[in-house]
């Protein structure tokens, strides 16, 4: 109903619920400390002028923007390292910075998106497995509220699959 009012009338009315545009604007205005990039980080900049770590992250960010999906780059999430261990009743928090923290405007559900871009590096793959385990221990599951994409030097990120993921989870 609110969306059907003229702009001058909208200024006189306070809607009971936020429109999608208002909700997205408020969601995007949340301030957070960005993870630092190294001084010699490659110069990959998104359409939103964000300095990202890889060409694949640039592609994901630009595809999210083109699809109208609000996202935060490397938004910090607080995780409990002892969440699943009954022998450690005390909290031991750490921060994970998913590559993208995305908002499905239709459902207003948030998704962490991890792009694992060097899966043919054994050390990287091992750290990725530990990170995914920590996500699961803190209630983030693939297909529920966690999106995972990955690539190796031989198998790059598929733009077709990426667009299907966006349509399935974020539209």
Question: What is each residue range found by the language model?
Answer:
Residues 97-130:
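Short beta-strand-loop-alpha-helix junction that forms the active-site gateway
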Residues 77-80, 118, 153-154:
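Short, solvent-exposed loop/turn segments at secondary-structure junctions
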Residues 1-73:
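Solvent-exposed, charged helical/coil patches
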């Amino acid at each position: 109903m609110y969306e059907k009012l003229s702009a001058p009338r909208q200024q006189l009315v306070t809607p009971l619920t936020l429109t999608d545009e208002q909700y997205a604007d408020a969601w995007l205005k949340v301030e957070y400390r960005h993870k630092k990039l190294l001084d010699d980080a490659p110069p990959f900049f998104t359409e939103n002028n964000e300095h990202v770590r890889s060409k694949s992250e640039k592609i994901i960010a630009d595809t999210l923007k083109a699809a109208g999906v609000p996202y935060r780059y490397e938004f910090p999430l607080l995780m409990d390292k002892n969440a699943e261990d009954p022998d450690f009743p005390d909290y031991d928090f750490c921060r994970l910075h998913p590559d993208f923290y995305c908002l499905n405007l239709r459902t207003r559900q948030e998704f962490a998106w991890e792009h694992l871009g060097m899966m043919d590096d054994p050390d990287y793959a091992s750290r990725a497995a530990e990170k995914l385990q920590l996500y699961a221990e803190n209630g983030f599951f693939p297909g529920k509220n966690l999106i995972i994409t990955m690539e190796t030097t031989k198998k790059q990120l598929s733009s077709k699959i990426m667009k299907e993921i966006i349509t399935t989870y974020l539209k």
